[in-house]
Design a protein with these regions (language model features):
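N-terminal start-of-chain detector that recognizes signal peptides
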Residues: 2-4, 45-46, 61-63, 130-134, ...
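Short, well-ordered beta-strand elements
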Residues: 3-6, 30
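C-terminal cap of thioredoxin/glutaredoxin-like
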Residues: 8, 14-27, 102-206
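Structural alpha/beta surface segment adjacent to cysteine/selenocysteine redox centers
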Residues: 10, 14-107, 191-206
Length: 206
């Protein structure tokens, strides 16, 4: 059975939707929380919520898609929000699957304020994590390492899977991932090799 690293950020609605589809993936999942903003900075990208028209589309699409999949879903009271404390909470919990799911659900199911300090403190108590544990250097270092590792592996967005040297980005890439796991030649055929070295014919002026 394959072991897959799953990179996610709690700020991402796509990560939440993907979480609820992980049982479709044949393999052992290693949960790797990362700071999406750090990946955006690394690659010089703009987040989808930073472009007004794209922001509205993303919110509408995710709401509709989650409904189609039968996933309980409601955007928090304000978005984007700062996910740093939630990411550290996941790490302090050892990134256990049930803890990751509980954190995601607390953000994406009730339409509440994800940045509310009292709600977050209640969540920490529920998961048995103290403020001191959240602010430990070990927790901070692991989040930084995860984000740096993701960037070094070519991860540019969340959610992303990494397996056998390949990145599969997006909650909608699970079918592609499953095809690769069933037959690695999916990414090793002649056309895929051609795409890897496809020349650039024009570059947009900055």
């Amino acid at each position: 059975m394959a072991s897959l690293d799953w990179y996610f950020d709690f700020v991402s609605p796509y990560s939440y939707i993907c979480l609820h589809r992980l049982d479709e993936v044949p393999g052992s999942i290693v949960y790797k929380p990362v700071l999406f903003a750090g990946l955006l900075n690394h690659w010089g990208q703009t987040g989808p919520a930073e472009i007004p028209a794209k922001r509205q589309w993303t919110y509408r699409w995710c709401t509709w898609w989650a409904g189609e999949l039968g996933i309980a879903f409601r955007f928090p009271a304000a978005h984007p929000f700062n996910p740093l404390h939630h990411l550290r909470l996941s790490i302090a919990c050892g990134n256990r699957a049930e803890a990751v799911r509980r954190i995601f659900d607390s953000i994406w199911q009730g339409g509440e304020d994800a940045g509310d300090a009292q709600r977050f403190a209640t969540l920490c108590r529920e998961l048995g994590i103290s403020e001191k544990m959240l602010s430990s250097q070990e927790v901070k270092d692991e989040l930084r390492r995860n984000t740096e590792q993701a960037a070094a592996r070519g991860v540019f967005g969340v959610p992303s899977f990494f397996v056998d040297g390949e990145v599969f980005w997006g909650a909608d890439a699970i079918g592609f991932l499953k095809a690769f796991l069933a037959d690695p030649a999916t990414l090793r055929n002649e056309e895929m090799r051609r795409l890897a070295s496809l020349p650039v014919a024009a570059v947009r002026k900055s």
